[in-house]
C-alpha cells in the first residue's frame, strides 16, 4: 500500500475539498432542521439532541478536513467515500494506485 497520494491525485482532491465540505455541512444542517422542526415544545430535549448531533458531526468533519495535507490525504479521501460524500464513479477519476489503496483502507476499516 502506498504511503502518500500521487501529486496528480492530490491536486484533484484539493480541487474537490470545498465542494465536499459544503456537501457535508449541508447534510448536517438538514439534520439540524429536521430535529428543530420536530421539537413540539420539547425545547430542552431538542437542544440536547442538537448538542449531541453537533459534537458527533464536528468530530466527523474534523477527521475529514482538519490537518488536510498530502501525507493524510488517502485517509481523508477514504473517509469522504465512507461517509458517502464521494461516489464510486468519482473515485475512478483517481489513479489506479490510489483506488487500490482506498479499497485496502476501507476493507481494513470494515
What positions do the PLM features span?
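Acidic, Ser/Pro/Thr-rich low-complexity regulatory regions
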Residues: 1-110
Amino acid at each position: 500500500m502506498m504511503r502518500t497520494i500521487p501529486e496528480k491525485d492530490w491536486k484533484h482532491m484539493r480541487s474537490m475539498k470545498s465542494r465536499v465540505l459544503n456537501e457535508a455541512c449541508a447534510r448536517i444542517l438538514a439534520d439540524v432542521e429536521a430535529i428543530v422542526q420536530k421539537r413540539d415544545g420539547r425545547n430542552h430535549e431538542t437542544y440536547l439532541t442538537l448538542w449531541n448531533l453537533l459534537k458527533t458531526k464536528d468530530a466527523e468533519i474534523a477527521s475529514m478536513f482538519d490537518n488536510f495535507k498530502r501525507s493524510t490525504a488517502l485517509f481523508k479521501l477514504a473517509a469522504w467515500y465512507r461517509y458517502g460524500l464521494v461516489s464510486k464513479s468519482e473515485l475512478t477519476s483517481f489513479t489506479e494506485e490510489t483506488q487500490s489503496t482506498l479499497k485496502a483502507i476501507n476493507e481494513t476499516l470494515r
